[in-house]
Each structure stands twice: as structure tokens, then as C-alpha cells.
Amino acid sequence: MTEKKKVVVAMSGGVDSTLTAKLLLEAGYEVCGATMHQFDGQEKEIEGARAMADFLGIPFQVVDVREAYQKFVLRYFIDAYAKGMTPNPCMMCDFKVKFGLFYDEARKHFDAPYFATGHYARILFHPERQKYEVHKGIDMGKDQSYMMYHLTQDQLAHIIFPLGRAFKKDTRRISKEKGLPTYNKAESQDICFLTSETSYVEFLKNHAPEAFSEGDIVDTKGRVLGRHRGIPYYTIGQRKGLGIAARTPLYVVALKPEKSQVIVGTNDELFRTRLLADELHFTDGEAPGEEFSCQAKIRYGIRVHDCTVTLERNGRAVVKFKEPQRAITSGQSVVFYDGDRLIGGGTIVRGL
């Protein structure tokens, strides 16, 4: 008798992860469930995941990642805002925790070669190139390939995304048809360590009150227009809540925490054709070349734009777009594609 392939499913107790586990069971895998213990106060979420594992009749394990989560996600989130950047905590959690410590520990605990999540992306093996590739999910409105540019070839050989060929609008219907009690469960929030009662500003005030020193709001010519309440209240492209009067609409075009300044300008001044990126990762393990043409996006949920990427000797890259991009934001990710295929990505240092 052929031994079943064993896979650990990252379970949250939600619609997508529960359906992922069910689909893998139906495909003949030996399925185990695991969930991350990221921070205190998660008892309800952990028990929800455990309940779904029990419902499916699969073994379940909680993996304590609190120390790594504190270091790589919470500390990063706080430090980024203090530096005038707009962090991407979900990306960092995937990179350092979910597909880092959790990926390693969950597979080790169950002695399982495979690891699956409910992400909407596809992993394909290209026989001619002898490379694993990440491709966009077929549901372009839900595609999460943007989050996967840090994955290595070794990881891609052991990761399964069963929902990559599904449409989000169908997952609740399919879940209901399969008798899964999660079919009508609400979607999870974007930043999991924030509650409905705690905004990111309140969180930062509790953990980094020094970041909220007041300062000047100045225009691009250096003229003082007013006062701001603290750098973390503002992000690139913001118009509302500036508290200044002007004849034309003004937007945040830059943040200078070292001077405690918020720089404002016109909508036209938000556009840049170039950006500088660092912390680069490429799915193939190396870049396509020292200079290459591709498509890129500068934040999740927008369309890609044609560009040229030029690598620098210091490990950074200059990305030049054919069309100006609005509100290039330090701390967000720029991600590169060749059609549907993910090439890689990096962290935006600043617009140029």
C-alpha cells in the first residue's frame, strides 16, 4: 500500500484554512493542523482552529512563536513608524514567522514534508528551467502572490496552495456544500494584533510614546504651514486630517522624523518615476540579470506597471517605471513580475 503524503496545514479556524485542510484530505493527503501562538490573548482564535481540526478529525498542534513575533513583527512595526516609514507587518509575519519559524517547527513536530496555507497563489514547476515558480492566483482580485517573493526554491518544493485555482467568491459556497461550519464565518482583520478597540495609533502610543513629538508641517519650499501631532499619524499620500488651510488640496509627500517634519505638496508632487529598494529576494535564488525589464507593483491590491530594475553593488536596486507612480511609500514592498510569474521583490527605501 502506498504511504500517504503528510502535510501540515496552517489553520486559523477561518474559511480558507479549513477548506484547505478539507481539500487536501479529499486529495488523499495525511493532514495535520497547526496554528501559531503569536501573542497573549489569542485563546479564542487558537480554540477556533483546534475546533476545526477536531471537526475534520486531524491531529492538531499549537506552535509558540511569541518571541519571534515580538522581535520580527511587533518591534519592526514600532520601529518603522518611528522612522517615518509605513510598515507592512503582514508581509514581515509571513517572511519571518509563518514561513520561517512556524514552517520549520510545524513540519518538524509532525515529521511532515509538506506545508499548506489558504493563500490565493499558485506554485508551478517549470521543467525546462528546473525551477519552482510562484504564479498569480486565478482570482486576480484576491491574488496573494505579492506576499510570496521571499520564498526560496527549497520552500517552494514543500509548500502547497490548494486555493490558488479557486475564486474567493466560491469558497463559502464550496465550504457549505462540504458541510464545513466555517462557511459563514467573518473575515479576519488586516493587522491581527490590533483589536477593534485598539487603533494602530493607540498601540504605538503605548509602545513608543517618544515617536509622537509634535513638529512643523512644511511645504516643499520649506515654508511652515502649521503643526503636526506626531509622525505616526501621517502617511505618504494622506490628505485628510492635516489641519491646515490652503487654496489647493495638499497631500503628505514626505516624512522627516529626524527633523520632526511632515512635508506637504500638491497631488502632482506625489508622483515619481523611480524608487530605491533594498532587502531584495528573488524566487529563482538570483536576479534575472544586473538589469532587467519586468512589471512591478508598489503596494498590495493595485495593478502592475512596466519598469526596468537595475541592481547596484551595495545590494540595492533602482526601479524605473515607464509611467509615474503615485505615493511611493518607504517601508512598503515593491514586487516584480514577468506576466503571471513572480520574479522577486524588496523593501522600498524611498522614491527618487
For the regions a protein language model found, what residue spans apply to each?
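ATP-dependent adenylation/nucleotidyltransferase module used to activate substrates
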Residues: 1-149, 160, 169-170, 176
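AMP-forming adenylation/ATP pyrophosphatase catalytic core
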Residues: 116-123, 128-352
